[in-house]
A protein has these predicted regions:
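Short helix/strand-bridging catalytic loops that position acidic/His residues to coordinate divalent metals
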Residues: 57-61, 196-205
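Helix-loop junctions and short alpha-helical segments
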Residues: 72-73, 79-167, 172
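Charged alpha-helical initiation segments
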Residues: 2-71, 83, 101
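Charged/polar positions within long, soluble alpha-helices
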Residues: 48, 52, 78-89, 181-195, ...
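Secondary-structure capping and boundary motifs in well-ordered enzyme cores
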Residues: 65-69, 73, 178, 206
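Amphipathic, Lys/Arg-enriched alpha-helical patches that create a basic surface
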Residues: 39, 148-185, 200-231
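Intrinsic-disorder-associated interaction segments
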Residues: 25, 29, 36, 70, ...
Length: 231
């Protein structure tokens, strides 16, 4: 019986394919809001499907779509906040937007500092740094959204007043807290009550109202962002 050759073969060095480094893309205001509206159009299209299913007597499927689009609408809000934050912070660096207090406290890695020094003609290092920092962040709570708007120089109070002009301050605050609470219930609890595990009620009317509130919030933020340009 012949012996098996168990010796390790030599490995050629530097033969692995190197992954291409993808730098963050900087979008302007128009592109960012266009991304949001594109996603929102899809959400509204799904709501039309929910209506059709409900009219045909398939309420369970209709309700399921309503719940999924509530979560989707907030994901669009979250992504919008990420993209508009990167845009505004880069504009502060460029000198076309007033710098917020929080801008001065941004954390920058030594690697990015070296990149900035050796590539003076490029400002991509800052966008890459911000993208890296925000990649795991979520702004879907009243506290985190308020804090993030402060970072980019937007007043949370002004945003709510512009989004819901016919409501009182207390009513505006409740709208936002309820929006985030319902999204969390759907995304993390299957939309069931913590007390007795009963399924929360949902219908097309509520989902459309919810989606409209998200659209109002984004429109308000965006108008304040554009208004804040200094050059």
């Amino acid at each position: 019986m012949s012996r098996r050759n168990l010796s390790l073969s030599s490995r050629n060095e530097n033969t692995r394919n190197k992954k291409a480094v993808r730098n963050a893309v900087r979008f302007d205001h128009g592109e960012i809001i266009a991304h949001f509206h594109e996603g929102l159009s899809s959400v509204k299209g799904q709501m039309a499907l929910a209506r059709t299913l409900n009219e045909k007597g398939n309420k369970e499927a209709s309700d399921s779509i309503c719940r999924s689009q509530i979560v989707m609408a907030e994901s669009l809000l979250d992504f919008y906040l990420h993209e508009i934050s990167k845009c505004c912070l880069c504009e502060m660096y460029d000198g076309v937007r007033a710098q917020s207090k929080e801008y001065s406290n941004l954390r920058v890695s030594l690697f990015r500092v070296e990149e900035a020094i050796y590539s003076k003609a490029s400002r991509g290092w800052l966008l890459d740094q911000i993208t890296e920092d925000y990649s795991s962040a979520c702004f879907l709570s009243e506290r985190s959204m308020r804090r993030q708007l402060t970072v980019i120089g937007i007043s949370y109070k002004d945003m709510l007043e512009r989004a819901f002009p016919d409501k009182s301050d207390d009513q505006r605050a409740k709208i936002v807290s309820k929006l985030f609470a319902r999204r969390n219930a759907i995304a993390h609890q299957g939309d069931r009550n913590h007390v007795d595990a009963t399924l929360n009620q949902v219908d097309e009317t509520y989902a459309i109202y919810y989606i409209d509130c998200v659209e109002r919030i984004v429109a308000s933020i965006h108008s304040l962002v554009v208004q804040g340009l200094t050059a």
